[in-house]
Amino acid sequence: MAVKVDKDPVPTSFEKWGKPGHFDRTLARGPKTTTWIWNLHADAHDFDSQTSDLEDISRKIFSAHFGHLAVVFVWLSGMYFHGAKFSNYEAWLNNPTVIKPSAQVVWPVVGQGILNGDVGGGFSGIQITSGLFYLWRAAGFTNSYQLYVTAIGGLVMAALMVFAGWFHYHKAAPKLEWFQNAEAMMNHHLSVLLGCGSLGWTGHLIHVSLPVNKLLDSGVAAKDIPLPHEFFDASVMAELYPSFAQGLKPFFTLDWAAYSDFLTFKGGLNPTTGSLWLSDVAHHHLAIAVLFIIAGHMYRTGFGIGHSMKEILEAHKGPFTGEGHKGLYEILTTSWHAQLAVNLALLGSLTIVIAHHMYSMPPYPYMATDYGTQLSLFTHHTWIGGFLIVGAGAHGAIFMVRDYDPAKNVNNLLDRVIRHRDAIISHLNWVCIFLGFHSFGLYIHNDTMRALGRPQDMFSDSAIQLQPIFAQWIQNIHTLAPGGTAPNAIASASQVFGGDVVAIGNKVALMPITLGTADFMVHHIHAFTIHVTVLILLKGLLYSRSSRLVPDKGQLGFRFPCDGPGRGGTCQVSGWDHVFLGLFWMYNSLSIVIFHFSWKMQSDVWGTILPDGSVSHVTGGNFATSAITINGWLRDFLWAQSSQVINSYGSALSAYGIMFLAGHFVFAFSLMFLFSGRGYWQELIESIVWAHNKLKLAPAIQPRALSIVQGRAVGVAHYLLGGIVTTWAFFLARSLSIG
């Protein structure tokens, strides 16, 4: 299929670049009131509101993607530059179990020098928990010069992306049919991006990472390791991996087993580094590459063979599903909001899956014994996943309001879900009530029994047991199965299911995670909070066009404060408001998830190996006995573990002590926006303006109180920011102290 582009569709205008709000007639006139700056930010990237031409909207989104990639490359470049210029990476490489990673040095302008703690090896700096040192070692970086070069490469890529964004909007812009060619896009993304991308990474792992890491593991100093290009010599590689002496002969004679010295299937963790075997990782990426290159030949493009997505979707109907998926292909090729909603839901869920793999199958050398990094990466991926999933709810509702055409969706699955929305939402609501009362009820019972001195009547591992038998069964199966399915493997996929304790330098990297009554109870709190988040987002989506309360909701748009005067009790019903409320429950859910993870790991996994071979855990296994009451969570988790952040003043961790307070302050500040009405502020502003007029200081731009929606947006933003900063400080001060 020929690539279709329009040449020079939009002239490059520096005049427009210099004019804020050029995309909107009202905004382009400049500010009359302070509302202008808020509307400018709200609408700058709302391409739907700037034009109704789907082709132009598609081009703007496409161009913005390149802008986004440019920002990512600049950000990554900065990370690598810090690693090259301000870090102890080379010292850490040679003594990774003793020296701590640092890639930031504070200038002592007003005495911040105290923050540069001693991280070992004669280096003073801020200890980082991004895990980049571990990633760099796995990739085969052996000196800071290589990091410099990569940082420069990142800037070159950023410049290229900025150019591409400009070029594909102003010089050669793709036609709409190019954006709508789903089959070609899928083939390209599967084969080229995922397939060839994985194959390229496999090549790097085999030719650079494996030899470098094998030498580092065996104790060779980083400065004595050959440079990457020296490994192109097969005789040098053959010293480490004998099959290299045979070249490509085993490949073409189908004697692939010969390559099993660097493409392995060991399972478990490398006992030197506490990470997945790098040769397993290379093998995995090779397999992924083969799978995706084949998958990228599935769809029918210019050759008349393969699948058509439209045909697959329309053929997919069961006996009870009416028209099935008919009409969904058109939705996904004409509504980018619908497409984005599906992708965000999937990517968000996948990101939370990644959070769990980072600790259960740690991919990078020495990462598993850096408890601060493990906690940071779990928290980071969990929260990012949560934001993406709420974004799915947001764009799903925007699709319903702006792009959904009921006439084109008669009796298909989407129409049937919308027509069943009362049954769906009322049942989901019942599930939420059931989960909430029962899960919380178990804690209320336990607190009451403990308060009354009746431990024998509590739900606990030593009284009335509520063992998670299904989870224990899954753990058991995963521990035993490899013995039958992969008899040559050394260990199972992950030690969290069962197996031996893996320790690096007398520090636990990973060990079996035993589950009991405490886990069963908090698991059902997770189930409750996640279901409530889904309830809010799904209700917002299903009722975004109409409801019994506001039948013409679709006409009011995605975000509106209330259904006008004389309609009391119609506030917070817009699609936007459901996203606003969903964010609080997302934060609520994930706070309990990361608290559960943090305490469980400190209690049952992280710790040191004593001379007699037993494990001394950080909090001595108190999770099973303390996490079964609300009082236990407050006393033995929040209060006991916040001692490090509260007592951090005067130490290298003191910034976290200040951030802990600042985060609480920002959180409290958010309540000022969430608990007060617009009228209060407008009244206050008018009295302040009167005072200015009295002094002949009248402002040229008229002050206006934030709109109701803007106030809620500022409120939820500061609520989340305050909560995230507080948690960040609490977790980091704690984990860096125990780490």
Swiss-Prot record:
One of its GO terms (cellular component) is plasma membrane-derived thylakoid membrane. The chain crosses the membrane at residues 61-84, 147-170, 186-210, 281-299, 336-359, 375-401, 423-445, 520-538, 578-599, 653-675, 713-733. It is a multi-pass membrane protein. It is an enzyme of class 1 (oxidoreductase). It holds the Pfam family PsaA_PsaB. Chlorophyll a binds at residues 672, 680. PSI electron transfer chain: 5 chlorophyll a, 1 chlorophyll a', 2 phylloquinones and 3 4Fe-4S clusters. PSI core antenna: 90 chlorophyll a, 22 carotenoids, 3 phospholipids and 1 galactolipid. P700 is a chlorophyll a/chlorophyll a' dimer, A0 is one or more chlorophyll a, A1 is one or both phylloquinones and FX is a shared 4Fe-4S iron-sulfur center. Belongs to the PsaA/PsaB family. PROSITE patterns: PHOTOSYSTEM_I_PSAAB. [4Fe-4S] cluster binds at residues 562, 571. Its EC number is 1.97.1.12. One of its GO terms (biological process) is photosynthesis. It catalyses: reduced [plastocyanin] + hnu + oxidized [2Fe-2S]-[ferredoxin] = oxidized [plastocyanin] + reduced [2Fe-2S]-[ferredoxin]. One of its GO terms (molecular function) is magnesium ion binding. Coiled coil: none annotated. The PsaA/B heterodimer binds the P700 chlorophyll special pair and subsequent electron acceptors. PSI consists of a core antenna complex that captures photons, and an electron transfer chain that converts photonic excitation into a charge separation. The cyanobacterial PSI reaction center is composed of one copy each of PsaA,B,C,D,E,F,I,J,K,L,M and X, and forms trimeric complexes. The gene is psaA. This is Photosystem I P700 chlorophyll a apoprotein A1. Chlorophyll a' binds at residue 664. Phylloquinone binds at residue 681. Keywords: 4Fe-4S, Chlorophyll, Chromophore, Electron transport, Iron, Iron-sulfur, Magnesium, Membrane, Metal-binding, Oxidoreductase, Photosynthesis, Photosystem I, Thylakoid, Transmembrane, Transmembrane helix, Transport. It is found in: Cellular thylakoid membrane. It comes from Picosynechococcus sp. (strain ATCC 27264 / PCC 7002 / PR-6). PsaA and PsaB bind P700, the primary electron donor of photosystem I (PSI), as well as the electron acceptors A0, A1 and FX. PSI is a plastocyanin/cytochrome c6-ferredoxin oxidoreductase, converting photonic excitation into a charge separation, which transfers an electron from the donor P700 chlorophyll pair to the spectroscopically characterized acceptors A0, A1, FX, FA and FB in turn. Oxidized P700 is reduced on the lumenal side of the thylakoid membrane by plastocyanin or cytochrome c6. Its main location: membrane. Gene3D superfamilies: Photosystem I PsaA/PsaB (1.20.1130.10).
